[in-house]
């Protein structure tokens, strides 16, 4: 037994501040390279937040058919216009794919609670057609925990305006990487998804969707679900060491490339991985 242990053992270095993870020599080398040139996302100029929590989705997340019905019930063109502006397309976690999304024709009635000192909360009496719709669910709305100043309003959300910005959106539970770019800030996301706003997201999304980061999250930084599942929690994503954008030739190439194999190859070059390390990463 002692001979077997000596033959099969690997030397690992443990930092007292980190969780203990047993890594093979090649995995230790990969981790060292990732951390030597990467900066944890918590030190980037970005913000990661979860999607909107309504407290009762049946009332606030509606189909296109229901949206049109509400708009048809508006008593004036003015009410119809401002009501249409308040009802926003929404993505659920399951709608978000790698580099894209399949919008399910769902909308959020965004009767937000305002932002203190910045934006007033929605006054429901200014939206009679929406009020009539929500009153059908009064018993549920009035007793739910996640509500604003009135049962008609959504809970406080300090980053409400971030939904209007260009952003990366992603779902929490996946089998791999599933990050998509909402270039124009068109969508709100539900509480089964997250959003990332800030600088250089066109570059960041290429790294987040890469095999390198999927490997690193799975083996070093993330939370596993069963044999293949990943849970992309914000507190773990912020640990990911990714090279900050400095306008290098390789980084600009990564941004400009659209072919997946070319993107992956450039990212391998960015981290200076050997052929053996690349082969090991590709086993995921």
Task: Give residue ranges: language-model regions.
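Conserved AMP-binding
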Residues: 264-284
């Amino acid at each position: 037994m002692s001979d077997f242990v000596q033959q099969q053992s690997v030397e690992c270095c443990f930092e007292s501040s980190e969780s203990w993870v047993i890594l093979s020599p090649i995995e230790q080398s990969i981790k060292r390279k990732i951390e030597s040139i990467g900066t944890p996302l918590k030190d980037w100029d970005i913000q990661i937040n979860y999607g909107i929590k309504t407290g009762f989705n049946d009332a606030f997340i509606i189909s296109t058919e229901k949206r049109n019905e509400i708009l048809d019930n508006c008593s004036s063109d003015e009410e119809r216009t401002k009501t249409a502006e308040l009802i926003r397309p929404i993505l659920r976690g399951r709608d978000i794919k790698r580099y894209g999304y399949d919008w399910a024709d769902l909308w959020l009635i965004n009767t937000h609670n305002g932002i203190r000192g910045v934006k007033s909360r929605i006054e429901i009496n200014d939206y009679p057609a929406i009020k009539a719709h929500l009153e059908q669910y009064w018993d549920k709305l009035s007793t739910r925990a996640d509500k604003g100043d009135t049962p008609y309003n959504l809970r406080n959300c300090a980053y409400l305006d971030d939904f209007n910005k260009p952003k990366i959106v992603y779902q929490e539970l996946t089998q791999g990487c599933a990050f998509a770019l909402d270039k124009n800030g068109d969508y709100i996301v539900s509480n089964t998804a997250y959003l990332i706003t800030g600088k250089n997201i066109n570059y960041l999304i290429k790294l987040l969707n890469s095999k390198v980061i999927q490997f690193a999250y799975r083996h070093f930084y993330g939370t596993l679900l069963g044999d293949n599942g990943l849970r992309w929690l914000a507190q773990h994503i912020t640990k990911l060491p990714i090279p900050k954008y400095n306008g290098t030739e390789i980084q600009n190439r990564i941004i400009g490339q659209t072919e997946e194999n070319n993107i992956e190859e450039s990212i391998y070059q960015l981290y200076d991985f050997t052929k053996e390390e690349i082969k090991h990463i590709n086993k995921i």
